[in-house]
Amino acid sequence: MSNPTASVRRGARPDLLDPTALSQLGGIEFIAREVVEGFIMGLHRSPHRGFSAEFADHRAYQAGDDLRYIDWRMYGRSDRYHVKQFEEETNLRAYLLLDVSESMGWSSNPSTLPNKLWYAKHLAASIALILLRQGDSVGVAAFHNQIVERMQPKGGRRQWHEIARRIRPLNAEGGTSAEGALRELAMRLQRRGLVILLSDLLVDRDETIRALKFLRHHGHEVLVFHIIDPGERELPPASEARFFDPETNDELLVSVADIRAEYREAVNDALGEWYRDLRPNGIDYEVIDTDRPLSLALRAYMRKRERLG
């Protein structure tokens, strides 16, 4: 078996690795940092307005800036003037809303494919790092039946390490109430910003859509990452399949041949309905399979961020 770490050392971009290889590289901070560095390398920076490799706690000195805030230590290291940047100067406030319900712990092939929560955590950490490097502030809320972890939006290098530390130990457990988490978040957000939902959307559909519309009505930009396992798109190559709901423990045994085409059509219809319900309301919606490189999701995020200026 090839060593994925060796591939990265030979110059392969980590953001283009499949999640199976990526999961062998190390912990969440290392992986997210490697993914983002590879992604930035691929951007060539110039097409992306406002992108900066510096963290939010510093920015380049501009004529008229208060000289009291020049960081002289940084000047000594880089021979360039930088001023200390405070939280209220950041461009955007963003909130990552992470689904940690029991269904997120599922993988169609646990021996080779990371589960949905692993993917969502690493995507969240990668987006958080990009946000902070752009001078934005970012917070996180994790939920199942209720919000179980919350961090207020802040900028700066330390915030990213704290985000990674807080989401790393979260396990997939409990049922899902995205609607409750979204409404609670809307009530707590004091300024308009960007809300990014990362979920498998095994939720009450109508309630969740109403809550997402509620956020848009209050002036927030919303981006939904629908995290799905490729095994949820297609039935396995077997004569029978056992359907199991990890949140209710209900089971159903069926003949695969009898329902394969119908199942595929039902899945595509369900994904299409999410798209048709959300996009006309100004809510960006992206389906992300857990066997795909994280760079695909990062591109979707960057498209959204560029539109916000």
Name what the model sees in each region.
Residues 182-186, 190, 194-198, 202-207, ...:
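C-terminal functional segments of enzyme domains
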Residues 1-155, 194-198, 204, 210, ...:
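An amphipathic, basic-hydrophobic helix/alpha-beta surface used to engage anionic
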Residues 220-228:
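Aromatic-lined glycan-binding groove of carbohydrate-active enzymes
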Residues 236-262:
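Acidic, Ser/Thr-rich peripheral helices and adjacent loops at domain boundaries
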Residues 149-166, 303-304:
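Short, electropositive alpha-helical surface patch
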Residues 273-304:
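Conserved, well-ordered alpha-helix/loop/beta-strand core segments that scaffold catalytic motifs
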Residues 159-193, 205-206, 228-229, 233:
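Von Willebrand factor
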Residues 135-136, 219, 282:
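Glycine-centered short loops/turns at secondary-structure junctions
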